[in-house]
A protein has these predicted regions:
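Macrodomain-like recognition of ADP-ribose-binding/processing modules
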Residues: 1-217, 221-278
């Protein structure tokens, strides 16, 4: 297992490459400029959205024992120019990249060590309308707001300490940044209300992906690690939303990338059971 010093060095190397490699620097500037925050996506003019959203006869839902970027890369390999893949970043709601500068090991930090996502999250709109907005809130449930960053460049692998990929293996993927509720502090919410909150947040994540004509979305055990949300409840919230009429035709594939520790009660097995993968 990697230690914090190794992960800090890796992140510093990632940032150095972003700042000094002409290609990465240019791509980062573009993705940062194109980053957008969706405060509340839904409004009364639903027909305008339906007109440009993609429609699929069916959606293939899959649970894989994999990391986020590794799963995304596999679904980009078939050369289909119409395929657009987005991944969900399990955000720290207050600070871009969470504890990546200090060697933290959660999902968001892993994404930031392997790609140019971190500087993109410092887009002025993201800082003002997402991070500052959440810092101004007094609860730990946070918000349905989503930050959308297109064409993030992944240029390191997903080893415990990510290593530089050969340049011909670099790839682009869109990133949806959103925070789950945090149950590590006392929160007065019933299981049914928590499930309803998750379903609302999941719908917003899906709508933003649909707005950008994403065909494959890579999700995961959203909020079920450091944020201490019950994985079976979260999995059922995802399952129920993806069975709703609007969302069951909105993507070609939905992938839940969840690393497995081999225990029968781990997040991978719980999500597999709920989503019918066993």
């Amino acid at each position: 297992m990697a230690n914090a010093h190794q992960l800090i060095d890796c992140f510093n190397d990632t940032m150095h490459r972003i700042q000094t490699d002409p290609f990465l620097r240019a791509e980062t500037m573009k993705s940062k400029a194109d980053t957008v925050v969706y405060p509340v996506f839904w409004d009364n003019n639903q027909a305008a959205y339906f007109a440009k959203w993609l429609y699929f006869d069916s959606c293939d839902v899959e649970v894989v024992a994999d990391t986020t970027f590794s799963a995304a890369r596999k679904y980009l390999r078939n050369g289909n120019e119409k395929k657009r893949v987005a991944v969900l970043n399990f955000a720290n709601p207050h600070y871009a990249g969470g504890g990546v500068e200090h060697g933290a090991m959660a999902q968001e930090e892993c994404l930031c060590r392997s790609s140019n996502l971190y500087p993109c999250l410092f887009a002025p709109c993201a800082q003002a309308e997402y991070y500052q907005f959440n810092r101004n809130r007094s609860d730990h449930l946070f918000t349905d707001r989503v930050v959308y960053t297109p064409d993030v460049v992944v240029f390191k692998d997903d080893q415990p300490v990510p290593q530089l990929l050969p340049r011909e293996q670099w790839f682009r993927v869109d990133v949806l940044t959103c925070a789950a509720p945090y149950l590590g502090e006392p929160v007065h919410i019933t299981p049914s209300d928590l499930k309803a909150l998750f379903k609302s947040r999941i719908r917003e994540i899906c709508r933003v992906a649909m707005e950008h004509q994403v065909t494959t979305v890579v999700l995961g055990a959203f909020g079920c690690g450091a944020f201490r949300n019950p994985p079976e409840l979260v999995a059922r919230a995802f399952c129920e939303v993806l069975q709703e009429e609007l969302y069951k035709h909105s993507f070609s594939k939905v992938v839940f990338a969840i690393k497995s520790n081999g225990r029968p009660d781990d997040n991978y097995n719980l999500f597999s059971k709920v989503l019918g993968q066993e």
